């Protein structure tokens, strides 16, 4: 369906904007990019033909963290506007080459990096985990793209399998049949491909006979919970499951992990889905681990810049990355570990530690890795 930018005014409530600037004031990339959400909303609403505005490279700097939308006092759908503009550009074939490649890779191989589908389950080769279709299970551990292919993030997948096996959880994975959840695909503007992924994944979930879905990534959690129209299956992020297992006495972290740790709230888990307490409950249950929050935490957490397709976008920003800022904040707190529960956050922070030369001061861990150490 052809997109008419003139419909954006009604579709995204642009006429409600009072030009207060709250959106721009809270934007995590405002100091690194010319992106100005207040100005974009006004220009889109009051320009006869806003299409030329959409060719600005800074439109790809948005991480879709939703800080602007959540803080807007009148209900303007700022992030939906960004997604609508990107969808318009996708239809016109006017997207950056790296974004184009990520979208094509997902269509062809089921993941934005273009890794072979046959290699999607290599990480689980010796773990004895059930493959749904070959066996039945109560829960699906939906692994996701980065936890399937990225060598660093695969450690999270392995840790969670061992944790769930230790707790006696009846779960399985989809193996080679698993495809991208589509969360970033939609936020990069490919609405048609997202709808195909949602339809195909939903059919696969239902066919597998599982009773619930457990995700590793908050981005997958968000897609299944909020964007899939007909999924009809309960969805949990793994931190919710681990808390339940601890509270039921099925999982007991018993080994000491002597360190001072802080926690970074991923945008798609915290801001957008209000899961703040579970990761902290897990960390404080680990013997020997002292915990302290950074000043910017929970709803005020600083976006790492990994969402909204930023993992595949180039340009549009300059200056110190938010990941580096976040690492400095954690170090100033005295933390030796910055923990998170999102593969994208983990990767951006690990890059930030290397770039800032801070590897002798702090390490980056996923919450699941700390739990596995304590088992």
Roles of regions detected by a PLM:
Residues 139, 260-261, 338:
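Conserved hydrophobic helix-helix packing surfaces used for dimerization/oligomerization
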Residues 17-23, 27, 62-68, 72, ...:
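Short cysteine clusters
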Residues 147-237, 268-284, 290-375:
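Cofactor-cradling patches in redox/metallo enzymes
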Residues 17-41, 271-274:
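A broadly conserved sequence feature marking short terminus-proximal activation segments
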Residues 5, 11-14, 31, 41-216, ...:
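Iron-sulfur-cluster electron-transfer modules
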Residues 1-9, 35-52, 277-288, 310-314, ...:
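Short, charged low-complexity linear segments at domain edges
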Residues 236-241, 247, 251-273, 285:
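Catalytic cores of enzyme domains
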Residues 1-24:
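Flexible, acidic/Gly-rich N-terminal and inter-domain linker regions that tether
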């Amino acid at each position: 369906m052809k997109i008419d930018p003139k419909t954006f005014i009604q579709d995204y409530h642009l006429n409600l904007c009072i030009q207060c600037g709250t959106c721009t004031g809270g934007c995590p990339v405002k100091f690194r990019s010319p992106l100005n959400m207040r100005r974009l909303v006004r220009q889109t609403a009051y320009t006869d033909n806003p299409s030329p505005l959409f060719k600005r490279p800074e439109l790809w700097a948005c991480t879709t963290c939703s800080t602007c939308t959540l803080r807007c006092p009148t209900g303007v759908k700022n992030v939906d506007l960004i997604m609508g503009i990107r969808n318009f550009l996708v239809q016109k074939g006017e997207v950056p080459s790296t974004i184009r490649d990520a979208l094509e890779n997902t269509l062809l191989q089921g993941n934005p990096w273009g890794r072979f589908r046959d290699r999607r389950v290599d990480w689980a080769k010796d773990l004895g985990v059930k493959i749904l279709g070959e066996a039945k299970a109560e829960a699906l551990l939906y692994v996701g793209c980065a936890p399937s292919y990225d060598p660093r993030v695969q450690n999270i997948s392995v840790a969670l399998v061992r944790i769930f096996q230790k707790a006696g959880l009846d779960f399985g994975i989809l193996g080679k049949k698993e495809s991208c959840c589509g969360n970033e695909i939609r936020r990069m503007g490919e609405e048609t491909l997202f709808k195909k992924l949602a339809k195909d994944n939903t059919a696969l979930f239902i066919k597998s006979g599982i009773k619930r879905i457990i995700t590793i990534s908050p981005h997958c959690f968000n897609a299944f919970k909020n964007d899939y129209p007909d999924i009809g299956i309960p969805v949990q992020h793994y931190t919710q499951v681990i808390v339940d297992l601890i509270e039921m006495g099925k999982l007991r972290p018993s080994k000491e992990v002597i360190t001072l740790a802080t926690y970074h709230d991923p945008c798609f888990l915290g801001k957008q889905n209000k899961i703040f307490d579970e990761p902290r409950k897990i960390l404080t249950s680990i013997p020997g681990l002292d915990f302290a929050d950074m000043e910017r935490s929970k709803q005020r957490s600083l976006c790492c810049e990994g969402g909204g397709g930023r993992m595949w976008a180039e340009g549009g920003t300059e200056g110190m990355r938010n990941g580096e800022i976040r690492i400095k904040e954690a170090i100033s707190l005295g933390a030796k570990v910055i923990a998170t529960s999102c593969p994208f956050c983990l990767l951006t922070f690990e890059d930030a530690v290397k770039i800032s030369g801070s590897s002798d001061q702090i390490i980056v861990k996923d919450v699941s890795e700390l739990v596995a150490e304590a088992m």
